[in-house]
Swiss-Prot record:
Native organism taxonomy: Eukaryota, Viridiplantae, Streptophyta, Embryophyta, Tracheophyta
Gene designation per UniProt: PSBP
InterPro entries membership: Mog1/PsbP_a/b/a-sand (IPR016123), PsbP_C (IPR002683)
Gene3D superfamilies found in the cross-reference section: Mog1/PsbP, alpha/beta/alpha sandwich (3.40.1000.10)
Any one GO MF annotation of this record: calcium ion binding
Residue stretch of the organelle transit peptide: 1-31
Cellular compartments per GO CC: chloroplast thylakoid membrane; extrinsic component of membrane; photosystem II oxygen evolving complex
Organism, as annotated: Brassica juncea (Indian mustard)
Subcellular location: Plastid, Chloroplast thylakoid membrane
Gene Ontology BP terms: photosynthesis
Keyword terms, alphabetized: Chloroplast, Membrane, Phosphoprotein, Photosynthesis, Photosystem II, Plastid, Thylakoid, Transit peptide
Protein name, entry field: Oxygen-evolving enhancer protein 2, chloroplastic
Modified residues (Phosphoserine): S107
Length: 217
């Protein structure tokens, strides 16, 4: 009887273990091939972004943004914006240049000073002693938060993060991310932005992904 009882307990334990194994899902750490719980299906795609292939460039645009016909900058060839907030948008500009590399413009800061029309007319860089932080002849202030230089496909790219603010700005300012490079006698610039309030409510991840995804062919 003891032997029979022992066998019964072992059998019950085996059945329980088997049931637990069947009911559990494959975790990412346990999935040897494919994706978790999707081993035999199609790979998952990032539905938050749409790949755009332009003339000589490609970029990932937030899927919920739509194309816009508004032309805001010289050489603009692409514009997408958030339907619910046009302050959140992406622009791609392509203009002729005699430079062989983006580094021929100088440092990222020096480059930005040569294309400061991207930040708004009469943008002022730095701090002012005037009340409200604005110079009498400036309609906007621009503070460079971060710059970076990276090599992508053998070409140097400039990345800049800039916070602009105007006297009548109700969003608290705009976070503007700029990616720039030179290829084949052309200057390529991608600028993605969002208002300060939306930036800290999650818009930053969409703007950052879009700006850093930009590359030339």
């Amino acid at each position: 009887e003891d032997d029979t009882s022992t066998v019964s307990r072992r059998l019950a334990l085996t059945l329980l273990v088997g049931a637990a194994a069947v009911g559990s899902k494959v975790s990412p750490a346990d999935a040897a091939y494919g994706e978790a719980a999707n081993v035999f299906g199609k790979p998952k795609t990032n539905t938050d972004f749409t790949a755009i292939n332009g003339d000589g460039f490609q970029v990932q645009v937030p899927a919920k943004w739509n194309p816009s016909r508004e032309v805001e900058y010289p050489g603009q060839v692409l514009r997408y914006e958030d339907n619910f907030d046009a302050t959140s948008n992406l622009n791609v500009m392509v203009t002729p240049t005699d430079k062989k590399s983006i580094t021929d413009y100088g440092s990222p800061e020096e480059f930005l000073s040569q294309v400061n029309y991207l930040l708004g007319k009469q943008a002022y860089f730095g701090e002012t002693a005037c009340e409200g932080g604005f110079d009498n002849n400036a309609v906007a202030t621009a503070n460079i938060l971060e710059t970076n230089i990276q090599d992508v496909g053998g070409k140097p790219y400039y990345y800049l993060s800039v916070l602009t603010r105007t006297a009548d700005e109700d969003e608290g300012g705009k976070h503007q991310l700029i990616t720039a490079t030179v290829n084949g006698g052309k200057l390529y610039i991608c600028k993605a932005q969002a208002g300060d309030k939306r930036w800290f409510k999650g818009a930053n991840k969409f703007v950052e992904k879009a700006a850093t995804s930009f590359s030339v062919a």
